[in-house]
A protein has these predicted regions:
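A residue-level marker of the well-folded mature domains of exported/periplasmic proteins
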Residues: 1-173
């Protein structure tokens, strides 16, 4: 399990959502985290850095997976750059160059071009595409409302508490 940068306020939302989804499977033993590393502080990846993720995966392969000789089915990654670091470490350890050749399933997010190509080549399992056109459209609507002295639209008035106040947000689907 890998997490995003601890300095990014969205990182805990992804991590907690993923762990909440995986919890029943971890609890009943259908899934295991070989390293036992499942807390946010341990799995987070400072600055979403690919090289940092690759180094952590190399260390996990050495310490938990006998240098690549123990099976590993998959790795949860919250960002395509982190995913590419993980995949490089797995490939270098001999797990295979593609999923078909034994490379563990690695998730991702942001649909970066390099990762989309890796998906097409059978290397990365998947990614999440967030349509920035929708984000830009909503941002323009909100900025226009604010410029006209109106309240920008918010569809979440409870989730994002920054410790000082709850920040109203518009969550895209």
């Amino acid at each position: 399990v890998f997490g995003g940068s601890p300095a990014d306020n969205t990182t805990p939302f992804f991590f907690n959502g993923a762990m909440d989804t995986l919890k029943p499977f971890l609890d009943d033993g259908r899934l295991t985290i070989g390293s036992g590393q499942d807390d946010f502080d341990t799995v987070s990846t400072l600055r979403w850095d690919q090289a940092t993720a690759q180094k952590r995966m190399e260390d996990l392969i050495t310490s938990t997976y006998s240098g690549g000789s123990k099976p590993l089915d998959g790795v949860l990654s919250p960002y395509d750059g982190i995913s590419r670091g993980i995949i490089t470490a797995l490939d270098n350890a001999g797990y295979g160059s593609t999923i078909e050749e034994g490379l563990p399933v690695v998730s991702g997010q942001d649909a970066e071009i390099a990762s989309v190509k890796m998906i097409a080549d059978g290397v990365q399992y998947g990614t999440i595409f967030k349509d920035t056109r929708k984000l830009a459209s909503q941002a323009v609507e909100d900025a226009s409302a604010y410029a006209e002295g109106e309240e920008p639209e918010a569809n979440d008035t409870e989730t994002y508490d920054n410790g000082v106040k709850v920040v109203q947000s518009f969550l895209l689907e």
